[in-house]
Amino acid sequence: MRHYEIVFMVHPDQSEQVPGMIERYTGAITAAEGTIHRLEDWGRRQLAYPINKLHKAHYVLLNVEAPQEAIDELETNFRFNDAVIRSMVMRTKNAVTEASPMVKAKDERRERRDDFANETADDSDAGDSEE
């Protein structure tokens, strides 16, 4: 089986349907005896240029190992699902399991924010004890 990186963009008004779509697509891959190596829901993001008069879309990234038939079925599902405004399937040499740069940056921002919140909480506790 080959490795693939799949990115699809969902209409922003259909964002609440994304978890169901992810479940359906991953189910189709696992039913064909494929494996999901990475699944990232990037959420609603600004588009580089308008697509169908839309300026935002909900992004999802999948790295899978699956037979060609499963990928063909997935592409057909993307094509006939009106909520999917763009999709891209690329074959890769190896399975990619590490977090993408987008997720790494998001995690770093979250860690910095949490560290800052902890520091300010410690500073306010220290200030209270001096009184």
Swiss-Prot record:
GO terms for molecular function: small ribosomal subunit rRNA binding; structural constituent of ribosome. GO terms for biological process: translation. Residues 98-131 are annotated as: Disordered. GO terms for cellular component: cytosolic small ribosomal subunit. Residues 104-116 have a biased composition (Basic and acidic residues). It comes from the Bacteria. It holds the Pfam family Ribosomal_S6. Keywords: Ribonucleoprotein, Ribosomal protein, RNA-binding, rRNA-binding. The keyword Cell division does not apply. The keyword Ribonucleoprotein applies. Residues 120-131 have a biased composition (Acidic residues). Belongs to the bacterial ribosomal protein bS6 family. Binds together with bS18 to 16S ribosomal RNA. This is Small ribosomal subunit protein bS6.
